[in-house]
């Protein structure tokens, strides 16, 4: 059993080592093919990508802000409707104050 296990583990090690060395060789070839000009061009492209990322982030931020404002407005409208139709409605601020007062008095 140990002999079979050793043969399997040796085969796995040699396969993983050959795959690793092939990957390293590929990376070296890609780096050698680029040369100095290719490397500087990649760097310039990255800086442009960063600017695009910043713009995307700003647009996302603006959209998110608008969505939050819209959601707040929707909740406000919903609250107004709820107050109108439900005589037992208590706003959350009032509930918070009541809980705070009870906590200070030691009832909770």
UniProtKB/Swiss-Prot annotation:
Coiled coil start-end: none
The GO biological-process annotations, alphabetized, read as: cellular response to nitrogen starvation; positive regulation of transcription by RNA polymerase II
Positions with biased composition (Basic and acidic residues): 1-10
**Descriptive protein name:** Putative uncharacterized protein YLR053C
Q: Please list where the region (Disordered) is annotated.
A: 1-27
**Annotated GO MF terms:** promoter-specific chromatin binding; protein-containing complex binding; transcription coactivator activity
Q: What segments bear the compositional bias annotation Polar residues?
A: 12-22
Name any GO cellular component annotation: chromatin
- Organism of origin is Saccharomyces cerevisiae (strain ATCC 204508 / S288c) (Baker's yeast)
